[in-house]
Amino acid sequence: EQAKKDTTTTLKSTDGKVIYVKDDNGSFREAKYADYYTKKEFYLKTSKTTGQYRYTGWQTIDGRTYFFDKNGNKVTGEQVIQGAKYNFNSDGSLNSGSGHMGIDVSKWNGNIDWNAVKNSGVSYVIIRCGYRGSTTGALIEDPKFRSNIQGAQKAGLKVGVYFFTQAVNEVEAVEEASMVISLVKGYNISYPVFLDVEASNGRGDRIDAATRTAVCRAFCQTIQNSGYKAGIYANKTWLNSYLDAPGLSSYKIWLAQYVAAPTYGGRYEMWQYSSRGAIAGIKGNVDLNVSYMGY
């Protein structure tokens, strides 16, 4: 907490070089510890005489996505960035057949500058549209859903949605799916509709694996019957122990595992590899994902 307020101590790279940030007026200044929590783009000075700076990280230029290494150079070939594998063409542009970088957001991410998100190299976003209360069982729309999906699509990002379930039977699962279908009507959803299945110390934790799997199937089948792609979000432990993952073979799997490389032995089409990402346009941490679905 103290570091978030430290506006006097200068940020430096691991080799002792001063790190800079660009202010809203376009001028560069030395970065302070507090900037780490508010700024998303950092620079190193390349020339003391000309005052040139180099950019490190993701950048979208003329509709193509690149990644600049610590020396300010475009990377090429196969690269592992923040634990996720990507493949870049010889000119540095991200290969269309490579995994695609994306994020997922909810009301907890606050107000988002979607144009800045798009320009940072993000290609898609999975937006929480709603959830069921873990104790009351009430169905609730995420208060940021409409502004998030409208802003993301206006910025040119592909979108999908997710719903946090606390359904305890198939009837409630269909009820949740019906709510989602109503919420996304009129929006161009190109990524799947995911059911978020995870621990919450609530009503959904008390059902067995067979019932939970039946809940997932009922939700996903209702979604697919309405013309959308459907999937399940869960971590490795839940996929292995609290769900019958092979019984969900008709639906996409979105794996959550915060490691350098996934150790889950089953099939998955999308991987959430960090909950502490830093993306321009979003204050604080954000979940990072890589999709292998090819769209």
Where are these regions (language model features)?
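Aromatic-lined carbohydrate-recognition surfaces of secreted/lumenal glycan-active proteins
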Residues: 223, 227-240
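Extracellular/periplasmic catalytic domains that process cell-envelope and extracellular macromolecules
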Residues: 36-37, 60, 95-97, 118-121, ...
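Hydrophobic anchor at the start of a short beta-strand
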Residues: 159, 229-231, 253
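Functionally critical loop-and-helix segments that line ligand-binding/catalytic clefts
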Residues: 96-110, 246-295
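Substrate-binding cleft of extracellular glycoside hydrolase catalytic domains
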Residues: 99-120, 126-220, 224-226
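Short beta-strand/turn micro-motifs composed of small residues
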Residues: 163, 234, 257
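Glycine-rich, charge-decorated loop segments at or immediately adjacent to ligand/cofactor-binding or catalytic sites
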Residues: 172, 238-246
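Extracellular adhesion/carbohydrate-binding repeat motifs centered on closely spaced tryptophans
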Residues: 1-100
